[in-house]
């Protein structure tokens, strides 16, 4: 619980930080009011005269409204255009289901504009229904039943509208034929249906979805009115689609144009197939609401299309087709009670979302389309339309429409990327007669620049002059410590005593250096500061002049600085790698390395030059070194050699002195006698142990019992077998020959 309580303030802080960051005004490369308002939705411009001080850039005028007010700009001088929408009230509201008719939106990049669209459902004045049926061999039973439904269908349409009309078309062997234009004559509808015959083939009518698109786009041929439009497809077969990212695998894609010639669909030589995108687009574009009536075994297959086609209704066809009229009634009730608000194609820099407030009390904000269900006649629903732009744009138009209904809203979008400033032409004298006053700043004539057009440029603009007062594009003009006058920085006088500001960009001063003993550069007697660096007087060194130049602490007893293996800094040795402070005299482990030179010592002692080639870094000395000793080393013969190593200053070569005499251990007679005695004792002990073991074994053997006396033989043993000898045959033959 404590962790949750701790987390809440953190989350609140993060939200506050995000809100604060969203209100920041980024004003890179801003020099005019237009640049300012285009740089971000939170930026405003102050057009007050003389708002900036001497040398201050015009970008100071660009900031958030709150910051500009704090800087002394009053609200009357703020230029801060806001996105807004103006709706044109509909004088014919009672005759329309969707209002308003027109909306004009003024849109500033990054700042949303909102407006409301109301939809009120009324009874339809006109409903057109086109009946499209697949007539493959398997449709014989359905055709017979549908042929008697003409009056029932028209009666169903007139129940839901003031004027209903029906039309008919068929699909036979992948070919669509438009048979009856939309009409209010149910008898004619029935007569045309009775003329139809099913195909003798049982093949699937593969062109049925292409026929759906032809019905949708051939407006004149079908006879669609500006009212509610329904397309009923009755089929007992699967569908085929062109290859796209959703469904289907075929390759020949329809061109989306009307190809009816005297009622017959004329393809381009090979069958065309619709993609889901084409199908949904053409139905929505022409405001046609599809109803697909299929047998129960095909319902799940066709329901896949509902994901991609808005307001598509799938009905289950009974075995005797008697429920077609009721399916149409149910589909109309369902489709008419669902209101889906959508818009035509818009450029990618514009974004439109919808907040839906439905009649049943539900709401659905921030969606790419408006959506309310359960809308009954005379119910009103409201949609809030939100539109934003990512950048400045040209004038745009788009339309908002409720799918399945003819009414639409025309939206005109205009960019807010220019400043509407106060008239200031009377203040042209502030520009020295060489420019005009606009939005609080001088717009200089060609050849002049500067805050008051006081600089004669022969080409460079005011912005170019300001650029010469910056070290780089990311730096502040004159480092924020000076004024840019005609392209040159005039540095301010500091209010801190003895502080001086100077440099081409006012980037230098005489105080921002390292300190020693609480003073800049150790005080004036040690050095002085210039542009962030200490310049020391004679006798002092160091980044803060903290060190004296004396080297007494770096000299060894031979008066060599750091023993030649380092440098003296601040009277202390900084030793080279491998040498030890304080005077860099010996390497770490120097005495341990004596043993490494033992073989060289013996080699040099024996004066065997050929064997001593690996001792190139040793210099043999005949003179012993004072106070330089090494422990002695012993060889395999027991002789001890004493030698001394010495490394001179400023050299990596060791000198070696080897003591002339070898100390070898001598073997005395007493030592020999002791060795003999020990050997004899060990031999006697071995013989005694052997005899004792032998006697014990003999005694154990004598105690074993004897059966049958000493005459016992192997033949008496239970496992013994008498050997059997057979005389070789060759021996007998040999005797016979003899």
From Swiss-Prot:
Residues 24-74 form the PSI domain. Keywords: Cell membrane, Disulfide bond, EGF-like domain, Glycoprotein, Inflammatory response, Integrin, Membrane, Repeat, Signal, Transmembrane, Transmembrane helix. Residues 421-454, 455-507, 508-546, 547-585 form the I-EGF domain. Disruption phenotype: Mice display normal neutrophil maturation and function including appropriate migration into sites of inflammation and response to bacterial infection. Following inflammatory stimulus in the peritoneal cavity, they display decreased levels of Cxcl13 due to the migration of resident Cxcl13-expressing macrophages from the peritoneal cavity during the inflammatory response. Pfam families: EGF_2 (PF07974), EGF_integrin (PF23105), Integrin_beta (PF00362), PSI_integrin (PF17205). The chain crosses the membrane at residues 672-692. Residues 693-738 are cytoplasmic. Residues 126-329 form the VWFA domain. Disulfide bonds join 25-419, 33-43, 36-73, 46-62, 218-258, 358-372, 421-439, 431-442, 444-453, 455-486, 469-484, 478-489, 491-506, 508-531, 513-529, 521-534, 536-545, 547-570, 554-568, 562-573, 575-584, 594-603, 600-664. N-glycosylated. SUPFAM superfamilies: EGF/Laminin, Integrin beta tail domain, Integrin domains, Plexin repeat, vWA-like. Residues 710-719 have a biased composition (Polar residues). Residues 709-738 are annotated as: Disordered. Glycans are attached at residues 29, 50, 102, 173, 226, 252, 342, 360, 386, 473, 627, 669. It is a single-pass type I membrane protein. Residues 23-671 are extracellular. It is found in: Cell membrane. One of its GO terms (biological process) is integrin-mediated signaling pathway. Expressed predominantly in maturing and mature neutrophils. The human orthologous protein seems not to exist. Belongs to the integrin beta chain family. During inflammatory stimulation, plays a role in retaining Cxcl13-expressing cells at the site of the inflammatory response. This is Integrin beta-2-like protein. It comes from Mus musculus. The gene is Itgb2l.
């Amino acid at each position: 619980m404590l962790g949750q309580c701790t987390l809440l303030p953190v989350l609140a802080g993060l939200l506050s930080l995000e809100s604060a960051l969203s209100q920041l005004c980024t004003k890179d490369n801003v020099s005019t009011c237009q640049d300012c308002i285009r740089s971000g939705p939170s930026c405003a411009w102050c057009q007050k005269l003389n708002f900036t001080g001497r040398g201050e850039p015009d970008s100071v005028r660009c900031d958030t409204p709150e910051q500009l007010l704090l800087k002394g700009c009053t609200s009357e001088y703020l230029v801060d255009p806001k996105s807004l929408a103006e709706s044109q009230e509909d004088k014919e509201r009672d005759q329309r289901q969707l209002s308003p008719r027109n909306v004009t939106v003024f849109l500033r990049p990054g700042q949303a504009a909102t407006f409301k669209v109301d939809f009120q459902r009324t009874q339809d004045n006109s409903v057109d229904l086109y009946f499209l049926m697949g007539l493959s061999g398997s449709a014989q039973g359905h055709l017979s039943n549908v042929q008697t439904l003409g009056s029932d269908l028209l009666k169903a349409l007139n129940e839901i509208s003031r004027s209903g009309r029906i039309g008919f078309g068929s699909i036979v062997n992948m070919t669509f034929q438009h048979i009856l234009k939309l009409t209010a004559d149910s008898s004619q509808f029935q007569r045309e249906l009775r003329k139809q015959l099913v195909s003798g083939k049982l093949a699937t009518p593969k062109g049925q979805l292409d026929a759906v698109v032809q019905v949708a786009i051939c407006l004149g041929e079908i006879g669609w009115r500006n009212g509610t439009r329904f397309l009923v497809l009755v089929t007992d077969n699967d569908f085929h689609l062109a290859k796209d990212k959703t469904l289907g695998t075929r390759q020949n894609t329809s061109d989306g144009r009307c190809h009816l010639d005297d009622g017959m669909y004329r393809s381009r030589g090979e069958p065309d197939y619709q993609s889901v995108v084409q199908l949904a687009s053409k139905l929505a574009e022409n405001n046609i609401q599809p109803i697909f009536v299929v047998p129960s075994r095909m319902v799940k297959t066709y329901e896949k299309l509902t994901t991609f086609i808005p307001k598509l209704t799938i009905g289950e066809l009974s075995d005797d087709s008697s429920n077609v009229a009721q399916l149409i009634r149910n589909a109309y009730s369902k489709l008419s009670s669902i209101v889906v608000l959508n818009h035509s194609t818009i450029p990618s820099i514009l974004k439109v979302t919808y907040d839906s407030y439905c009649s049943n009390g539900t709401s659905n904000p921030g969606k790419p389309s408006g959506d309310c269900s359960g809308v009954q006649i005379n119910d009103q629903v409201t949609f809030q339309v939100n539109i934003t732009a990512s950048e400045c744009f040209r004038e745009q138009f788009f339309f908002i429409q409720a799918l399945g209904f003819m009414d639409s809203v025309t939206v005109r979008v205009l960019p807010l990327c220019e400043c509407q400033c106060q008239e200031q032409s009377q203040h042209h004298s502030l520009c020295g007669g060489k420019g005009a006053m606009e939005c609080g700043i001088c717009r200089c004539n060609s050849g002049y620049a500067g805050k008051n057009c006081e600089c004669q440029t022969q080409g460079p603009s005011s912005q170019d002059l300001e650029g010469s007062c910056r070290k780089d594009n990311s730096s502040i003009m004159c480092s924020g410590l000076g004024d840019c006058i005609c392209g040159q920085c005039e540095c301010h006088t500091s209010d801190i005593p003895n502080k001086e500001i100077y440099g081409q960009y006012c980037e230098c001063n005489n105080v921002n250096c390292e300190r020693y003993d609480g003073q800049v550069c150790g005080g004036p007697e040690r050095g002085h500061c210039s542009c962030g660096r200490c310049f020391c007087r004679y006798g002092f060194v160091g980044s803060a002049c903290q060190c004296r130049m004396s080297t007494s602490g770096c000299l060894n007893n031979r008066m060599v600085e750091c023993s030649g293996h380092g440098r003296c800094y601040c009277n202390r040795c900084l030793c080279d790698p491998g040498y030890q402070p304080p005077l860099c005299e010996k390497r770490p482990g120097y005495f341990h390395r004596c043993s490494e030179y033992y073989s060289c010592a013996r080699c040099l002692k024996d004066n065997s030059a050929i064997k001593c080639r690996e001792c190139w870094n040793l210099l043999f000395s005949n003179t012993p070194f004072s106070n330089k000793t090494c422990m002695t080393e012993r060889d395999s013969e027991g002789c001890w050699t004493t030698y001394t190593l010495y490394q001179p200053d400023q050299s990596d070569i060791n000198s070696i002195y080897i003591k002339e005499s070898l100390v070898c251990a001598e073997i005395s007679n007493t030592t020999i006698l002791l060795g003999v005695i020990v050997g004899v004792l060990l031999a006697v002990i071995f013989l005694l142990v052997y005899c004792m073991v032998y006697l014990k074994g003999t005694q154990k053997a004598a105690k074993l019992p004897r059966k049958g006396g000493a005459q016992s033989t192997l033949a008496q043993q239970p496992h013994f077998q008498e050997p059997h000898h057979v005389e070789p045959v060759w021996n007998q033959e040999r005797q016979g020959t003899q």
